[in-house]
């Protein structure tokens, strides 16, 4: 087999093991807003909702949970999410699709997808660091809440 054929075969094989992440930043720049999250009852992974809420609170949001299937016009700022966990030697976050709506219109979206990750070992990630990364990219103008507080307040 020629070297070109080997390279082509390697590219085809590796392209099937892709992990993708695509973020459209929200552009929101106000701190400490209330963010209403529409609970997705299909997400049953232990602790996911607590982790997602904690990550958003660290970003400065006051999180209020809305019932499953609430309209995106229920609050001025609404978040929805779809999350898939898979098992392959261990349970891991395989896909997360986070959407933010401002006044009923999509204002930002973050999608992490390792469903085509195949044998790629980078698919084995922990939920909190990945959600933190996605939220930081989704709200790039908002600094983490702890970093915004004066040192005297943090020490108290």
Residue ranges, per PLM feature:
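Generic hydrophobic secondary-structure signal
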Residues: 6-14, 56, 98-100, 131-138
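Surface-exposed short loop/turn segments
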Residues: 21, 55-125, 129
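A sequence-composition feature that detects small, non-aromatic residues
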Residues: 8-13, 18, 32, 90, ...
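C-terminal/domain-edge helix-coil "capping" segments
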Residues: 18-28, 57, 110, 114-156
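A structural "domain/chain start" motif
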Residues: 4-10, 16-65, 147-156
């Amino acid at each position: 087999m020629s070297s070109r054929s080997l390279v082509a075969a390697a590219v085809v094989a590796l392209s099937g093991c892709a992990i993708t992440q695509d973020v459209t930043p929200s552009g929101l720049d106000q701190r400490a807003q209330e963010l209403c999250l529409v609970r997705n009852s299909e997400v049953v992974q232990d602790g996911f909702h607590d982790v997602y809420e904690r990550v958003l609170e660290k970003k400065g949001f006051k999180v209020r949970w809305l019932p499953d299937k609430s309209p995106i016009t229920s609050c001025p700022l609404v978040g929805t999410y779809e999350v898939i966990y898979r098992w392959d030697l261990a349970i891991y976050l395989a896909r997360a699709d986070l959407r933010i709506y401002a006044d009923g219109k999509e204002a930002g979206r973050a999608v992490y997808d390792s469903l085509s990750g195949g044998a790629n070992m980078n698919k084995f990630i922990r939920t909190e660091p990945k959600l933190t990364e996605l939220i930081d990219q989704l709200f790039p103008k908002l600094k983490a809440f702890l970093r915004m507080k004066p040192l005297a307040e943090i020490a108290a």
